[in-house]
UniProtKB/Swiss-Prot annotation:
Protein name: ADP-ribosyl cyclase/cyclic ADP-ribose hydrolase
Reactions this protein catalyses: NAD(+) = cyclic ADP-beta-D-ribose + nicotinamide + H(+); nicotinate + NADP(+) = nicotinate-adenine dinucleotide phosphate + nicotinamide; 2'-phospho-cyclic ADP-ribose + nicotinate = nicotinate-adenine dinucleotide phosphate
Signal peptide start-end: 1-24
InterPro entries, per the entry: ADP-ribosyl_cyclase (IPR003193)
Modes of activity regulation: Activity is presumably regulated by its sequestration in vesicles before egg fertilization. After fertilization and upon NADase release, it could then be regulated via its potential phosphorylation sites.
Chief place of localization: cytoplasm
Species: Aplysia californica
Annotated disulfide bonds: 39-58, 75-155, 136-149, 230-251, 263-272
Length: 282
């Protein structure tokens, strides 16, 4: 799940004068207050009948999170940097409801329906607290940069992806039963399955033998050319990888529920008019 609109800035700690405007990223203001506020909101009001609460309180979680990147050169971070935080924030995920996604952030989350149908990483406590936030460490006090974060493209990949890579790994490791993976089958520039995606690098490799089946949903965007189909191209590569891990594999293209979701935004699309006839929709 390569988090679109999710920026965990684990950036190179350089002086502000060396950062050009085009490279600057503005960090989230009052990061600690935002973190603690989201944490308390989650604890009291979010997913109460869907996901369990964690044992650590919000202050303890903040300490583990802040300790992971503060007073450090961000380019020296790796996937183990946030280990204590994810251990403290770990939740037991409901069986048969874990969902992964690549390139279909909005559609996947609309389909998951805030945990009612599926659980996404962004529905878990770590994902909910840090989604869309920006932060970066520095060696000088107060340990993190409050004004500007540089672009982290110069950092090694393990540093750039230290937070969300570990988040994806931990999330996948907790999955049980059937898992669902939604991909974009209409993108001419990017394969539906990529080995270098978050799913390819962190999630698929960390699925345990508690998983029984991987169900792939291929989303074909309305009015756009179909680029990839089940059983061919990168999806055939994915099928082989899944079966090599001894999981059952299913693949479907624009299933009825997904098509209806797409048609809710564009009911006059050709595919939607045909669906109305086929499914006898009013």
């Amino acid at each position: 799940m390569s988090p679109v609109a999710i920026i965990a800035c684990v950036c190179l700690a350089v002086t502000l004068t060396s950062i050009s405007p085009s490279e600057a990223i503005v960090p989230t203001r009052e990061l600690e207050n935002v973190f603690l506020g989201r944490c308390k909101d989650y604890e009291i009001t979010r997913y109460l009948d869907i996901l369990p609460r964690v044992r650590s309180d919000c202050s303890a979680l903040w300490k583990d999170f802040f300790k992971a990147f503060s007073f450090k050169n961000p380019c020296d971070l790796d996937l183990g940097s946030y280990k204590d935080f994810f251990t403290s924030a770990q939740q037991q995920l409901p069986k048969n409801k874990v969902m992964f996604w690549s390139g279909v952030y909005d559609e996947a989350h609309d389909y998951a329906n805030t945990g009612r149908k599926y659980i996404t990483l962004e529905d878990t406590l770590p994902g909910y607290m840090l989604n869309s936030l920006v932060w970066c460490g520095q060696r000088a006090n107060p340990g993190f940069n409050e004004k500007v974060c540089p672009d982290f493209k110069t950092c090694p990949v393990q540093a750039r992806e230290s937070f969300w890579g570990m988040a994806s790994s931990s999330y996948a490791h907790s999955a049980e039963g059937e898992v669902t993976y939604m991909v974009d089958g209409s993108n001419p520039k990017v394969p539906a399955y990529r080995p270098d995606s978050f799913f390819g690098k962190y999630e698929l490799p960390n699925l345990t033998n508690k998983v029984t089946r991987v169900k792939v949903i291929v989303l074909h965007r309305l009015g756009e050319k179909i680029i990839e189909k089940c059983g061919a191209g990168s999806l055939l590569d994915l099928e082989k990888l899944v079966k090599a891990k001894h999981f059952a594999f299913d693949c479907v293209e624009n299933p009825r529920a997904v098509l209806f979701l797409l048609c809710s935004d564009n009911p006059n699309a050709r595919e939607c008019r045909l669906a109305k006839r086929f499914y006898r929709i009013a």
